Amino acid sequence: MTETQPASASFNQPRYWLWWTAATIVGWIIGYAINNLIITVFNFTEEAVTQGDRPELIIASILALISMGLSVGLAQWLVLRREVPTSTLWVPATTLGFAVGIWFGLAFMGLGTGLAQWWVVRKTFSKGSWWPTISAIIWPLGYVAGGSVSGALIVPLGSQLLAGLVGIVVTGLIIGAITGAVLLWLLREQRAVGAA
């Protein structure tokens, strides 16, 4: 048995999944916009990164990592809090998990995020240990798929910024849709445990 139960008795699963997926997409779009602003402000060019002669790029990199995790975490929390009132630390956990995870490499982006998010909801979901596993697979997969779409669209769209935006939407869609399905499963399982 778990310490807390998901909140609402009336639960529209398809709507909740759509909200979760949309929130994840919006979070990625906001993070993308903030990251583009950071790139502009710090004149973050590939040449400057490879030469390593600008210490402020470290600050820019940290800000970029924090902003992406923060924007996705906040957008998801706005949906999650409706059903999981104990999720108050979701935003800082997602921010930290994403930043630390991706700092170690793209493959760890989902693991870091998933572990941090699981820590927040571990007492709510009896089968919540699936969350980091799914996140470890889906976050990098979504990111790579979005990056591939973005790369394929740069020439046809004639804009790296627009192609990147489409890629980010694909990233958010994949991550949001699959983690949303897992979240629904966890919520259903928890309701079944609570009803027993």
Predicted regions and their residues:
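Juxtamembrane/disordered regions of integral membrane proteins
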Residues: T2-A196
